Amino acid sequence: MSAKPIKVTITYCAECGYEPQTLEVAGAVMKTFGHEISSITLIPWVDGAFDVRVGDELVHAMERDGGFPKSETVLDAIRAQLAS
């Protein structure tokens, strides 16, 4: 594991059916980083939410950014935290 624990949190609208997008992002993180992150947390929510945090950084918010994030956006945020 990385010396610096990196936590990824995905808050998604369960009632909206956002599970496929959630699993796509989570799968990309797991496949790319595996043991380099300390946890991936999936939080079912409501109100159209789809937010992704890497550590304390909000890297995507559906309300702010619109739509779903590209997996590469999330992976780049993790790379940046690993490099810092």
What are these regions (language model features)?
Residues V59-S84:
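Non-catalytic, surface beta->alpha helical segment in thiol-disulfide oxidoreductase systems
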Residues C13, I40, M62:
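Conserved short-loop catalytic and cofactor-binding motifs
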Residues A3-V29, F33, V46, L82:
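Short, thiol/selenol-centered motifs that function as redox-active sites or metal-ligating centers
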Residues T41-W45:
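Short beta-strand
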